[in-house]
Amino acid sequence: MKRLFCKKVLGGFALVLMGAFVAVPAAMAADVAGANISGFVDVSYSDADNSNSTFSLDQVEIDIEKDLSDKLSIRVDVNHLPDTALVFDDLIEQGYLTVKLDNIGTGLDVTLGKFNAPIGFELLDPVDMYQYSHALVFDNGLPTNLTGVMGAYKVSDMIDVAAYAVNGWDNSSDNNQSKTIGGRVGMNAMPGVNVGVSLITGTNETTTVDKRTVLDIDATITMIDNLTIGVEYNSGTEENANLTSDGDGEWTAFLLMGHYDLDDTYGVTARYDTFDDEHGSRLGNSVVEKQTALTLAGTMSLGDGAGLLAEWRRLDSNQNVFNGSTEDSTDTFAVEFTYSF
């Protein structure tokens, strides 16, 4: 089964490479052999006061979607990040089958494979972001991808639910006997207000049965024309992960973002986020600390799928954890160009 899936993925990738020699209208997905092909290129320049400045090819991604029937579809996201090895797990950001069971209520969608974690406000890909960087809660309080099975059901026009059983946080193959389980309830509370409540819990280590549990609440508010407001609250525990004494490691995080489109071309963004690593278990610095970030960005649409943004980000800690543990703050400036098709 694994070999068959690999052949399908590689076959699709070969099809994409062949399609690269065919003219494709800008900012439009290609349709080749019944498959919808889209993707993006992400390049940047960044300068941090505690490290070198650099130009970077950050990501190249090609997404392949195909309906095999009215009840079965597949999707594969082939994604290369230059800093990762050319191994299967790194190349395939997502790869899954979706089965539509229309005879169950309003319709149950069952997804099997590797998929982006349905939790939190921010999304993974840069073309879906208003800033160059992700917030602290995205980087430290949430999984990125999950591998397993997920069911999604639309209860009504106002409520949808999803539940899943997976191999753990960002594990394509499980490293223990237990499965991580989770779910999300999405609510369209009123026009222009969408709220999601997510819970995920399970074992993520090979040598222990200690569980990591996270409650995450996110909201997207678009009640005012041209203004998008994002809010997220995250609370997590990991059993026996307290670095200061016996007990569980705990953390809380918060995000508030606002983006305003000045017109069809220009936009401005501000984001404030915090991460309180109460027992030193999540930020990776082996100390109890609280980090706070302020991010300001300007966006510009260049048309035909092209976009440009400039970002300044100030990251502060109540401990000296930057520049070789000698400073408690760091500033980063970045310019990013993306092209999606």
Say what each PLM segment does.
Residues M1-V32:
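Cleavable N-terminal export/targeting peptides
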Residues S56, V127-S133, K179-I181, G249, ...:
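Flexible, surface-exposed loop regions and adjacent strand-edge segments
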Residues A48-N52, D83-F88, L136-L142, D170-N176, ...:
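Outer-membrane beta-barrel domain signature
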